[in-house]
Amino acid sequence: MPSVAIAGAGLVGALNACFFAQKGWDVSVYEFRKDIRTMKHVQGRSINLALSQRGKSALEAVGLKEYIVNQGVPLYARLVHNKDGKTYSRQPYGKPGEHIVSINRRHLNEVMITQAEKSPNVKFFFEHKVKSVDYDKKQLVVQCTSQPSRIPTFGTKSPPAEHEEFHVEADLIIACDGAYSAVRRSLMTIPRFDFSQEYIEHGYVELNIMANNNEFAFEENVFHLWPRGHFTLIALANRDKTFTVTIFAPFTEFEKHMSTTEEVLSFFEENFPDAYLLLGKEHIADTFNRVKPQSLVSIKCSPHSFFNNLVLMGDAAHAMVPFYGQGMNCGFEDCLVFSETLEEQNNDIASAVQVYSERRVNDAHTINDLAMYNYEELKDLVNKNSYKLRKKFDGFMNAIFPKSWIPLYSMVTFTRIPYSEVVDRRRKQDRILSNLWKTTSTLALIGAAIGIYSNRGRLGL
């Protein structure tokens, strides 16, 4: 059977392992961290994940959808908290019943690793750091950081010494090693490889609202949102009755208004009074004393494939800011699209790799841009009448033309329409709306002119 070497055992790497295990390939996964299933605390991002249709479709393809969805909390709407801490507005995500699912990142990752390992042809090598890719040999360069080494050996060959680099050969290499991908970095000198990176001015800090007498402290089946212009607070429910709370703000805001305990408590009490009471003074103060704001980066690159046997996926190909809830969903869809492409190309790896990149680059760039746009929506637009009016208009049109007029958010979240096509459809909707507005305005002006002409005598004209 063909072999695949996967760099990274995070969400996308673990799901890829499940896909190729299902195909019967020989799978080797190299991960620089220890096995997260054995760790008490896992470093890295823990912003709750919002599982939507693209991610569900990928999980369904490997038989995990039902289990994972049942492990999450369904969210049917945004609940926008006003600054007075007492009034709210509810904004349903889509049609009745349509929802996203709040999922714990670590649990999802552990489930997929365990699922992949059920296949005897799959092996995970933890504490094995992928350093680069060897252009000439088309192999991964890996460094063992564990003792003793768990690198597979054959015959009389001795295992490599501690920290010795070694090469991994496979028919296919998939780099899922994150936003700071070592594989992608080693490709940067290749001519015509385009790359862009942008850190946004905002950072984030995570907090928690604990269960109240083993019950949720407030409504669990909504995405809680406190939009305050240039900074925003969000909260998503967990199965254990807690909420993961995240504040997004410019680094300058953290420095000016959240540098001391007194400042941060005053800031939360003034801007998020209801959340402030549930979080508690001690937890807010302790969190900000221990944790520094984390940065958010947006990355694009093109192409996503090289050498007819190497593919970049997930954050290694398209790290995005988390404001559309599509980072994981897009990464999972990468796995599904590549699996579908392999089947279409009759398992011809070289053809599949090329076709995949051609299909995926534009979509990845598009959702990256949409994620940046959606932050403007989350932090400010949701409170504007123009936004609310457009949302109602889209809902009205969707009820009349359910197949041809689908709201932007619904296309992204509740379908598998390619991201680039989603934007094309939205632009068409915008043109129709613009023409409709012009026509309505013109008719109104004509009507006004007729009225004035008919009453010119009384008006003294």
Swiss-Prot record:
Keyword terms of this UniProt record: FAD, Flavoprotein, Membrane, Mitochondrion, Monooxygenase, NADP, Oxidoreductase, Pyridine nucleotide biosynthesis, Transmembrane, Transmembrane helix
Catalytic reaction annotation: L-kynurenine + NADPH + O2 + H(+) = 3-hydroxy-L-kynurenine + NADP(+) + H2O
Known pathway: Cofactor biosynthesis; NAD(+) biosynthesis; quinolinate from L-kynurenine: step 1/3
Report the membrane topology from the UniProt record. Multi-pass membrane protein
- What are the BP-aspect GO terms? 'de novo' NAD biosynthetic process from L-tryptophan; anthranilate metabolic process; kynurenine metabolic process; L-tryptophan catabolic process; NAD metabolic process; quinolinate biosynthetic process
Pfam families assigned: FAD_binding_3
Q: What is its main location?
A: mitochondrion
Q: Which Gene Ontology molecular-function terms are recorded?
A: FAD binding; kynurenine 3-monooxygenase activity
> What do the Gene Ontology cellular component annotations say?
mitochondrial outer membrane
Q: Where are the transmembrane segments?
A: 395-415, 432-452
Q: State the family it belongs to.
A: Belongs to the aromatic-ring hydroxylase family. KMO subfamily.
Described by its record, this protein's role is as follows: Catalyzes the hydroxylation of L-kynurenine (L-Kyn) to form 3-hydroxy-L-kynurenine (L-3OHKyn). Required for synthesis of quinolinic acid.
The entry's protein name is Kynurenine 3-monooxygenase
Tell me the organism.
Answer: Caenorhabditis briggsae
Gene that codes for this? kmo-1
